[in-house]
Amino acid sequence: MQRLAKLISNAGICSRRDAEKLILDGQVKVNGIIVTSPATNVDTDNQVEVSGSLITSSQKSRLWIYYKPVGLITTHKDPLSRKTVFEQLTGLPRVISIGRLDLNSEGLLLLTNNGDLARQFELPSSKLKRVYHVRAYGNPDPLLKSNYKNLEIDGIFYNPQSIKLLRKNSTNSWLEVILFEGKNREIRRIFEHFGLKVNKLIRTEYGDFKLDNLKPNEYREVTKKLYKC
């Protein structure tokens, strides 16, 4: 027996939180009957439908590294009808993302068909390193010389692990930022706080996984032995 929301998440339909919302909205049936409690327990032999589609509770956990291009949002449905990551993917089963990259950011995005695996990666206790290469307009010295750790901006505390200069020319600088727990628009807000305008932001690493030679909108599957689930 397992919770209905967990089963839906593990099937790669959506995150557990979104699964709970689908259940509360009456979009889920168990053995043909609408169920509205996310805490409902189900057996593996129960028939579960989400928005009219039958799902299976048992499947092999899989993980992919995807190069998310600029201009796509990391969601399955967007109320503003913007293009999403999942609309662009071909040749993959139903997957969910591990974390997000915003509309104007690009680079490494992990995808999985297992909600529990996604949750394991996203937990702060996992302490997985995220590496970003950032191109910014302006003088980076005030940022680099500051005590940027435990920085408070508009009541929110940010704590990047490190920020270092990679290269610099007369107008732009490339910097490497390492985070262990990323907050919404954290890098952009830190840079803006020091008068820097971010004009390119690429995530190059997440935990043990690297973008390597992937190009925008390309993906590759990760060998199972390289991760635990």
Curated annotation (Swiss-Prot):
CDD domains assigned: S4
Domain S4 RNA-binding: 2-69
Catalysed reaction, written as an equation: a uridine in RNA = a pseudouridine in RNA
Active site per the UniProt annotation: D102 (nucleophile)
GO molecular function list: RNA binding; rRNA pseudouridine synthase activity
GO BP term, pick one: enzyme-directed rRNA pseudouridine synthesis
Keywords attached to this entry: Isomerase, RNA-binding
A Pfam short name: S4
EC code(s) of this entry: 5.4.99.-
Top EC group: isomerase
SMART domains: S4 (SM00363)
InterPro entries, alphabetized: PsdUridine_s_RsuA/RluB/E/F_cat, PsdUridine_synth_cat_dom_sf, PsdUridine_synth_RsuA/RluA, PsdUridine_synth_RsuA/RluB/E/F, PsdUridine_synth_RsuA/RluB_CS, RsuA_PseudoU_synthase, S4_RNA-bd, S4_RNA-bd_sf
UniProt cross-references to PANTHER family, sorted A to Z: PSEUDOURIDINE SYNTHASE FAMILY PROTEIN-RELATED (PTHR47683), RIBOSOMAL LARGE SUBUNIT PSEUDOURIDINE SYNTHASE B (PTHR47683:SF3)
Family: Belongs to the pseudouridine synthase RsuA family.
NCBIfam families tied to this protein: pseudouridine synthase
This protein's name: Uncharacterized RNA pseudouridine synthase RBE_0321
Species, as recorded: Rickettsia bellii (strain RML369-C)
